[in-house]
Amino acid sequence: MNDTLRMKKWWMLMLLLTVVGINDSLAQAAPAAAERDVTPKYSNEFLNIGVGARALGMSLAQVATVRDVTSGFWNPAGLTGINSDLQIAGMHSEYFAGIAKYDYAAIGKSIDSVSAASISFIRFGVDDIPNTTELIDAGGNIDYDRITTFSAVDYAFIFSYGRKGFPFGQGRAATSSAGSGDAFRWGVNAKVVYRHVGDFAKAWGFGLDAGAQYDYKKWHFGAMAKDITSTFNAWSYTLDERTKEVFTTTGNEIPVNSLEVTLPRIILGAGREFNIKKITLLAEVNALMTTDGRRNVLVSANPVSIDPGLGLEASYNKVIFLRMGVGNFQRVKNFDGSDAMTFQPNIGLGLRIKNLQLDYALSDIGNVSDVLYSNVFSLKLDIVRSDRK
């Protein structure tokens, strides 16, 4: 059995597992959804914002060409691109004029010549939210001193493993970023999600991802199946009698323990490298396919919608980087009732000094889309043992 046949069988297996996972998830969600909507759109959406200023500058087009510790988020197959003993990355960004804060940190390690692993941490939170349930005292008087604050925070821990070669048989595990042959890589994620809203509500969730990458000369191909078996978030609520009374008086529904299901999404990508002396040009296009029903994206259908993204990167001697991208195509309705298509253009810069890389991205330049612009900075550090330098 040659490598090409193994590769085809592996891609077919990934596709089959994804389809089976989607069908099984929809089948499990349907009975419960008849009583309560347990498969809402944008479930665990904080896990789809993206990590790394490089990726954000390229409009999230990463699944085929990512090769560093951020692969634990984008495609665990790319972890095999870690060449140092340890690689550490971090990012901080703020949204909605600083109201929401997004933090990311990851550490990855090359296990041997064909495998690598990483641990990633993500926090997305809104802090200091006023709690006005006790604003009015027993005498009916407004007392602002009774206002307290709480936080609504989402956490995720992602444990990733990537490996070169085909899972079935030895296959060919040679790297080929410079066109020296073809290479296949695969990877898996196990993620734990914890979300809480003050002391009132909390949820635990668990999910699995699977990804693969394949290089042919200067072409790169990738596939990522997120929440391949669906991610189940078990919500529990703790409300005291006073809070329940306030909810009833103000016409709010008292929440009950429930199960929220995050349905699978598939990302397909293709990229191409162009080398001109010390200048390297990289272009990648991704197609994000969601399975949670019709969305207002470029290709809108039920249950699968497709949102494309395009990213470009130019580098000089792998030291200075200039990036741009376009994505987040949205169908929006104007005030006059007409429909319009918006998109989000991004740009980015990068600078590598020895083992340290600093990246910057500016999203939604020119305020073209309905999304507010954001400035994003990220760092990446390679740690190499002194005996290997």
Where are these regions (language model features)?
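N-terminal secretory signal peptides that target proteins for export/translocation
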Residues: 1-7
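Hydrophobic alpha-helical segments, especially transmembrane helices
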Residues: 7-10, 324
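Short linear interaction motif-like sites in intrinsically disordered regions of transcription factors
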Residues: 11-12, 75
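Bacterial N-terminal signal peptides
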Residues: 12-21
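Sec/Tat signal peptide C-region and signal peptidase I cleavage site
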Residues: 22-27
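Subset of outer-membrane beta-barrel
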Residues: 28-389
